[in-house]
Swiss-Prot record:
Gene designation: leuD
InterPro entries: 3-IsopropMal_deHydase_ssu (IPR004431), Aconitase/3IPM_dehydase_swvl (IPR015928), AconitaseA/IPMdHydase_ssu_swvl (IPR000573), IPMI_Swivel (IPR033940), LeuD (IPR050075)
Name the record gives this protein: 3-isopropylmalate dehydratase small subunit
Keywords: Amino-acid biosynthesis, Branched-chain amino acid biosynthesis, Leucine biosynthesis, Lyase
Family, per entry: Belongs to the LeuD family. LeuD type 1 subfamily.
Lineage, uppermost ranks: Bacteria, Pseudomonadati, Pseudomonadota, Gammaproteobacteria, Pasteurellales
Length: 200
């Protein structure tokens, strides 16, 4: 898994608070157990006018032409509330989002996002409002996220954010739970060679 250090990208301004995981990925699309293929169902009930998902809703922000190819999602407080389904960050990541910015995230969704190599950034409500205003006024312009410096640069303004150092280390180095375990492969192998035969 590639490490995450910096990203410059377009921002989708999702002007809504308390966006729950059922809105992010509705329950009828949860049958699959792999992480791929969920992006086409992201925000399905908001994004499409029909059940089949063939008629895009032109009034939903994700369908606006100027936000196609965006890699950063901007939202209001309590993003990812509701059920604990891990499919929600799967859908966001499969669509192409790498960073989410909001005043707050539901705890389980926040951790699931980090576990799936996405960066959820908490900023104050005032800072998030400033970014919304900038995005609306600067159509087509990118913002810059620097995980090493822990900053978000929006136009000529720089915002700082916090992240647990262990989580930051994992993102910077592209490490998931398996990758972390494999860092100790030599020690694991040495231990296995020395345990009694009846325990093997």
């Amino acid at each position: 898994m590639a490490g995450f250090k910096q990203l410059s990208g377009l921002v989708v301004p999702l002007d809504a608070a308390n966006v729950d995981t059922d809105a992010i990925i509705p329950k009828q699309f949860l049958q699959a157990i792999t992480r791929i293929g969920f992006g086409k169902h992201l925000f399905h009930e908001w994004r499409y006018l029909d059940v089949e998902g063939t008629k895009p809703n032109p009034e939903f922000v994700l369908n606006y032409p100027q936000y196609q190819g965006a890699t950063i999602l901007l939202a209001r407080k309590n993003l990812g509330c509701g059920s604990s389904r891990e499919h929600a960050p799967w859908a966001l990541a499969d669509y192409g989002f790498k960073v989410m910015i909001a005043p707050s995230f539901a705890d389980i969704f926040y951790n699931n996002s980090l576990n799936n190599h996405m960066l959820p950034i908490r900023l104050s409500e005032e800072e998030v409002e400033e970014i919304f205003q900038w995005v609306w006024a600067n159509e087509g312009k990118q913002i810059h996220v620097d995980l090493e410096a822990m900053t978000v640069t929006v136009g000529d303004k720089v915002y700082t954010f916090e992240l647990d150092e262990f989580r930051r280390h994992c993102l910077l180095n592209g490490l998931d739970n398996i990758g972390l375990t494999l860092q100790h492969e030599d020690k694991i192998s040495a231990y296995e060679k020395n345990i009694p035969a009846f325990l093997r």
